[in-house]
Regions:
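Dinucleotide-binding Rossmann-like beta1-alpha1 core, especially the glycine-rich loop
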Residues: 63-148, 276
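Glycine-rich Rossmann-fold phosphate-binding loop(s) that bind the pyrophosphate
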Residues: 27-28, 50
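C-terminal accessory subdomains/tails of enzymes that are appended
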Residues: 10, 19, 51, 97, ...
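A conserved short coil-to-beta-strand element within the FAD-binding core of flavoproteins
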Residues: 190-205
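Extreme N-terminal leader/targeting segments of oxidoreductases
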Residues: 1-22, 37-41
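Flavin (primarily FAD) binding-site architecture
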Residues: 227-240
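Core beta-strand elements of the Rossmann-like FAD/NAD(P) dinucleotide-binding domain
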Residues: 18-20, 214-224
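Glycine-rich FAD pyrophosphate-binding loop
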Residues: 39-59
Length: 615
């Protein structure tokens, strides 16, 4: 296997040699969406992330694209309306990453919510979604609920409401935003840390950057600096705290120990009434999430920092198991049934609400005298619309600072993500090579008048995601193999390989139209077609693809966020960690010391996910 040109080396050279309109700090959902929105408008964009892309909050979510049914009880109608609009948009622009899932929300005698209140809430939810697909909700009686999910508590059940929201791969959703940004000239680099302090040089801000991979320092020149560091916004900005960060913990158990027969179930904790989800993901089930205030180590008032350890504690595991066992009495889950845990911080806005549940999921955008534009709050589902607002504000600031040149109105409302934007012909799925090559030549267009963002694109036809829509883009993608209207070289048909049904489903749902590149690896080297875990559909080829095309730089990047054995395998991917480290060493030219370091870091991360057992 011969490595392609190293994307990171190309990107690093661009960071040092070019001048940018925006430097986005933070490679999670918010930062990735901002980079994509700005780049597709014609701005020159750089993004730096101190760890891996989506390595913090954005890969520790419940992995849902949803309107937030429970937010209705707090009167957050605008947030639910916006979230449902974005959910429906993702169903069209990223159908492989926004997969409809039936949810059952049972009602019980003497418990909140009552059947009538639940029916009203779900009906309002449908109305705020404008009664658009996937499907409308319906009421089920207790007998039908028992037939659909036999293990669900039947005592006192008064029926249930069935509604539909969507599941996603949160880390991959972030990744595809970055990949798309790269096709229109953005440059994004992981393991690059930016310091809050900077200096001015004419119309540019000069930021100090540390390459945590290479160990050296350099400067990046940009007209505007954007702080998109999520829950670390307060510690990065150094200003008055604006966030009320909370910790959310999830458990992963075997699907046979907590079977929901393919449906997600909404449950309430018997201890405090908090709403949680029981979510089937392949042959596993996710239980979550908790919500506890951030306990700054030694200083409860201190904002969290990226180096802080965010993990599950025994109290979290006990709480989630208690909730699951109350909702599913036959399960009788024990701590030994927990395959793994994952935990993350939510960047909730501090609006002075009395409870964590009522804390705002909305976002805030503000600038300061030092030259930074800050964004905080929000949720995974609304990452695109939040980014649109940020870029609108950024353009206003750039105008105030005398920036001239071509900027288009927002392009992301109907623009497919990479896995959805190619033609599917004769069972052949095509994809993209690594991004972040030389930026494309922009097509000039007049800057819209101040205070406007230009006309919104018309909503696409429901099948638009299968059309070669990228060919209509004013900017040709950078570093794309071949023409978008013709099959990519070596693209391989799903039907030409003898793959198990679960593997076929996994590959198409994960990579969408990019799956041809993964299949090409299997076709070229048979050993890459083997399963990495007997219970799971992951292939060895995906390890190679993660390193070459999906921007992975460390063993943990590969096995936690690209091929998530760390979350779903009983061995946590430790049995293929050595193989992954060897691949990285070969592809990236590592020394033995560097290879061992990456392997050690991954083993430590796996160990941290099980530290609750020693509490």
């Amino acid at each position: 296997m011969v490595a392609e040109a190293g994307w990171r080396e190309v990107a690093r050279r661009r960071l040092e040699s070019e001048e940018f309109d925006l430097l986005v700090v933070g490679g999670g959902a918010t930062g990735a969406a901002i980079a994509r929105d700005a780049a597709t408008r014609g701005l020159q964009v750089a993004l730096c992330e101190r760890g891996d892309f989506a390595s913090q909050t954005s890969s520790q979510s419940s992995k849902l694209i949803h309107g937030g049914l429970r937010y209705l009880q707090h009167g957050a109608f605008h947030l639910v309306l916006e979230s449902l609009a974005e959910r429906n948009r993702l169903l069209e622009t990223a159908p492989h990453l926004c997969r409809p899932k039936e949810f059952l929300y049972p009602a019980y005698a003497g418990r909140f919510p009552s059947p009538m209140l639940l029916a009203l809430g779900v009906g309002l939810y449908d109305a705020l979604a404008l009664w658009r697909p996937p499907v409308r909700s319906r009421r089920l009686d207790s007998r039908e609920v028992h037939r659909l999910v036999p293990w669900l508590r039947s005592a006192g059940m008064l029926g249930a409401q069935q509604y539909v929201d969507c599941q996603t791969d949160d880390a991959r959703l972030v990744l595809e935003n970055l990949l798309d940004a790269g096709t229109v000239g953005a440059v994004a680099v992981s393991q690059v840390e930016i310091q809050p302090d900077h200096r001015s040089s004419g119309n540019f801000r000069v930021a100090q950057a540390t390459d945590r991979d290479r160990g050296d320092q350099f400067e990046i020149r940009a007209r505007l600096l954007v702080n998109a560091t999520g829950p670390f916004c307060d510690s990065f900005s150094g200003g008055p705290p604006k966030l009320r960060p909370t910790v959310g913990v999830h458990l992963v158990v075997d699907g046979d120990r907590l079977p929901t027969l393919g449906r997600a179930v909404v449950v309430h904790s018997p201890r405090d009434g908090r709403l949680l989800f029981v979510l089937p993901v392949g042959c596993r089930t996710i239980i979550g999430t908790t919500e506890t205030d951030w306990p700054g180590p030694g200083d409860p008032a201190r904002p969290p920092r990226p180096e802080d350890a965010i993990r599950a504690y025994r109290r979290d595991v006990d709480y989630l198991l208690e909730t699951a066992n109350h909702a599913f009495p036959p399960a009788d889950l024990q701590p030994k049934d927990v395959i793994t845990t994952f935990a993350g911080l939510r960047p909730l806005m501090d609006r002075g609400r009395a409870t964590r549940a009522a804390a705002s999921r909305e976002h805030a955008i503000w600038s300061d005298a030092s030259g930074w534009l800050h964004v905080a709050g929000g949720k995974l589902t609304t990452m695109r619309s939040m980014a649109e607002e940020v870029v609108d504000r950024a353009i206003e600031i750039l105008r105030e600072r005398g920036r001239q040149g071509a900027v288009r109105p927002c392009q992301t409302r109907a623009r497919p993500l990479p896995g959805a934007g190619e033609t599917i012909q004769m069972g052949t799925l095509k994809g993209f090579a690594p991004p972040f090559g030389p930026p494309p030549t922009p097509t000039p267009r007049s800057l819209p008048p101040s205070g406007t963002s230009g006309p919104a694109p018309s909503p696409p036809h429901p099948l638009a995601a299968l059309a070669p829509s990228r060919s209509a883009s004013p900017n040709p993608p950078a570093m794309v193999r071949g023409e978008l209207s013709s099959p990519a070289p070596h693209a391989t048909s799903l039907g030409s390989l003898d793959l198990a049904p679960d593997i076929t489903a996994h590959l198409t749902e994960t990579y969408g139209a990019r799956v041809g590149q993964v299949l090409s690896l299997v076709a070229s080297e048979a050993s890459l077609g083997r399963r990495l875990d007997p219970d799971l559909p992951y292939l060895a080829a995906e390890l190679v693809f993660a390193i070459r095309s999906d921007l992975a730089c460390e063993v943990e990047d590969v096995l936690r966020r690209r091929v998530p054995l760390a979350l779903f395998s009983r061995t946590h991917g430790l049995d293929v960690a050595e193989e992954t480290a060897n691949l990285l060493a070969r592809e990236r030219g590592w020394s033995e010391q560097r290879r061992a370091q990456s392997l050690l870091q991954y083993r430590a991360a796996v160990s941290a996910s099980g530290m609750w057992q020693a509490d």
